[in-house]
C-alpha cells in the first residue's frame, strides 16, 4: 500500500499533466487549427494557463500550499466551464447572456465520437485538476490552523 505522501505526489503530478495538456490543447486549437476562442473560452484559459506554472513551481520547490494556490483558479474556471457547457448544450438559452463579442459560445468546432466538444474538454480538465487538489489536501494531511491568542 502506498503511503499518503506518495499518493499526494501522484495526484499533484496528475494535476500538472492535466493542466499542461489543457494548455497545449487550447493553443493547438487556436494557433494550429485556427479556431478563434469565444469569450467564455478566454476566461477559462485565464484560469488554466497559470496552473501549469504554479503546479510546476510547487512541484520543484515541494511547496505544500499548492492546493491553496490552484483551487481558486480551478474552481473559478470550473464554474465558467459549467456555465459554458450549459449554454453549449442548450440547457440554458443563449439569450440569457449572449456572447456578443467575437465567436458565439455555442459554435461547434469539433464533436469527437458525437459528444466530445471543446467546452466538455475544458470541463473535464478543470474537474480533474480540482479533484486532484482536493485529494492532495486529504493525502498531504493539511489541517486548518487557527491561531489562538
What positions do the PLM features span?
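Secretory/periplasmic and organellar redox-cofactor proteins
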Residues: 1-40, 48-149
